[in-house]
Amino acid sequence: PAVEAVIIATPQTEHREIAMAAFAEGKPVFCEKPLGASINDATEMTDAAEASGLPNMVGFNYIRTPASQFVRKLLANGELGKVTWFRGEHTEDFLADPQTPASWRCRGMSNGTLGDLAPHMINAALALMGPICSLLCEFETVHKERPGGDVGNDDHAQIMCRFDSGAMGHMYFSRVATGRKMGYAYEIHGTKGSVRFDQEDQNSIWLYRSEGPESERGFRQILTGPAHPDYEPFCQGPGHGTGYQDQIIIEARDFLLAIEENKSHWPSFKDSLQVSRVVNAALKSGEQRAWVDLLSV
């Protein structure tokens, strides 16, 4: 009775069991990404969440920056015109050294790059661009052996995709991208402009608008400030910036609001199931070396 909510921050192989038990006890649930270790786990968890009617949410914190929230607003308002292209990556180098010992992240397909890093950028793509209808994926294990055991999943992967809107896309994910510490970045092209964002410079975006004299056109940097979503509670001065932990605070606030209002906030389990569906399709595509229609998986 003293437990008011459950936060799941374990390896994803344990997410389903904890979530199912929490919903059975009538507790709201916040689950770290990815939702489950497999599409079956994610589907079962979502069904339980929907049946319970309890507040639920999944932790995709990187999309919470004021900069990325501003990009969502630009796109929703049609500021870039018809969007034609999305390019995203989530690249890090924490396993670039083949002498780094194997850990739980090196075992099981759900813990590889497609299960660990890809969900963050796939979530961004869905949030910014809308549903993905088809994709082609390939993945590879770069370092097959490490101290402590063999590696049983992918070190890097790439996805070509088509969105329901008709836009094309490409995403790349890597945990062996030498020199890249937090390469969560994306660029979006539209008929009236383009925008790009890089998590390593999370307090700004680069925006291009197809307007004005040709001689004065170009990408311009926009520093986030109180005029942008969720910035002012942290600082009243533009350009001073927010940090990584502030993204966590923003999503924690939304989960507390979900509990207070007794309704799920974005991204809910239902929203996050769409990320799991894309990951599942990517795994099938990589195994079959063929395009996969999301409606078929």
Task: Indicate where each model-derived feature is located.
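Rossmann-fold dehydrogenase core element
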Residues: E44-Y62, G81-F86
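C-terminal glycine/acidic-rich active-site capping loop/insertion
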Residues: N61, K144, Q158, R162-F163, ...
